Swiss-Prot record:
The keyword Cytoplasm applies. It comes from the Eukaryota. This is Probable histidine--tRNA ligase, cytoplasmic. One of its GO terms (biological process) is mitochondrial translation. The keyword Nucleotide-binding applies. The lineage of its organism: Eukaryota, Fungi, Fungi incertae sedis, Microsporidia, Unikaryonidae.
């Protein structure tokens, strides 16, 4: 017998779920546009060679597709690598773009925590040379605006610099070749105990002493005072670390000007497991919520160059919003079941022609409206439908109303009833005093 269940890590969405997803996406999109970004679209699947060796240990999570006519393809893992491919293939050196679309990962799903195998990401990126940390600060500002907009609660934007992290690993004595795999383990700090982290690092070749030294650095926390601690540490003698610390100081300064430094935290343990990051990295989360980070991103200056021999380097910085995770935090309180503003009902008969005439007037005025389709529908059942869908108004067509060229307008919330001429119906419904 054919199974009717959805594949593991995927889900159907009810109208209520779709309405919330659409609202979240539209609100995020408006913020992207506010910051001057333009939209692009890229294919859901890419050439496998484009995606290979860009995600570190997460490469194993890529969904491969069956060979089609000699092209080895895979479903996109994120929207960042396709954007880099878009820049390189179109020889674009400067762009501020957003893209909202589905991505695919062979991860262990947890629907309650918003972790799926198919999910929507909303990306914002700035490509091109810029004044020191200016684009990075604008990215943080955009993240801050999105997090505050949803009113979910207190949030934290954690930042670090990949160069600081690799400098620490150099001081610890980790080989350059192991930076990526060690960072992938460090990236699990909030999901695993330090004992488990240590065991995994030992399996990757670190000694017990190296693990202890790594832990000392990774447990530095706080705000800009962490940068002061780094300046007093031997790691500051490494030039790339020195440059990164200066960049972080400038980031905090610019974020103060932009009014988004209040939730900004310097976190040395922030690693971001993806291989393509080169500078500032960030993650954002709502404090005390169980879904983990809802936004992640950073600077990736070499990704376009690494796509092929003839590709040039285009500095980029940006972030992805995990729409499903924000959805999981908002859904319980969300109750929208319909976009309909007016339900056209009938009392004492079918009155099909009259209902359709009223429906046309309402829809010509851009008022979302609907009516019933069955041959029989009691007015009581119509009212139950309106209550279930939380439709604000019922416009009732009946024998007496037809004779008078009128309709009865019922406010479904207040139960206020009013007889209104058909030609005045639209203005009555749109009058704020009648809402």
């Amino acid at each position: 017998m054919t199974s009717l269940k959805t594949p593991k890590g995927t889900m159907d969405e009810s109208p209520r779920q779709c309405f919330l997803h659409e609202e979240i996406i539209e609100r995020i999109r408006r913020v992207f546009v506010l910051y001057g970004a333009v939209p692009i679209s890229t294919p859901t699947f890419e050439m496998k060679s484009i995606l290979t060796n860009k995600y570190g240990e997460d490469t194993k999570l890529i969904y491969d597709l069956k060979d089609q006519g000699g092209e080895i393809c895979a479903l996109r893992y994120d929207l960042t690598v396709p954007f880099a491919r878009y820049l390189a293939s179109n020889k674009i050196r400067r762009m501020k773009r957003y893209q909202i679309g589905r991505v695919y990962r062979r991860d262990q799903p947890s629907i309650a925590r918003g972790r799926l195998r198919e999910f929507v990401q909303a990306d914002f990126d700035i490509a091109g040379e810029c004044i020191q940390m200016m684009a990075d600060a604008e990215v943080v500002s955009c993240v801050d605006r999105i997090l505050s907009m949803f009113g979910i609660g207190e949030y934290r934007i954690k930042v670090n610099d990949r160069r600081i992290l690799t400098s620490i690993l150099e001081v610890v004595g980790v080989s350059c070749e192991s930076y990526g795999t060690v960072c992938s383990t460090i990236d699990k700090i909030e999901k695993m105990s330090w004992e488990d982290i240590g065991r995994e690092l030992v399996l990757k070749g670190l000694s017990e002493e190296q693990v202890r030294t790594t832990k000392k650095y990774m447990t530095m926390g706080g705000k800009e005072d962490v940068l002061g601690l780094l300046k007093a540490d031997p790691v500051y003698g490494i030039e790339r670390c020195k440059a990164a610390v200066h960049d972080m100081e400038e980031l905090f300064r610019l974020c103060r000007i932009l009014g988004c430094s209040g939730s900004l935290v310097m976190d040395i343990s922030l690693a971001r497991g993806l291989d393509y990051y080169t500078g500032m990295i960030l993650e954002a989360e709502y404090v005390g919520k169980s879904v983990g980070s809802v936004i992640g991103g950073g600077r990736y200056d070499n990704l376009t160059e690494n796509l092929g021999e003839r590709c040039v380097s285009t500095p980029c910085v940006g972030f992805s919003v995990g729409v499903s995770r924000i959805f999981s935090l908002l859904y319980e309180e969300y109750d929208k079941e319909s976009s309909t503003m007016v339900y056209v009902g009938a009392s004492g008969g079918l009155f099909l022609d009259e209902r359709l005439s009223v429906l046309r007037i309402l829809q010509d005025a851009n008022i979302c409206s609907e009516t019933f389709y069955t041959r029989r529908s009691s007015f009581e059942s119509q009212q139950k439908y309106v209550a279930k869908k939380k439709i604000p108004f019922i416009v009732v067509v009946g024998e007496s109303e037809i004779a008078a060229g009128s309709v009865q307008v019922i406010n479904a919330l207040t139960r206020k009833k009013e007889i209104v001429k058909v030609e005045q119906m639209v203005s009555y419904l749109l009058d704020p005093e009648n809402q």
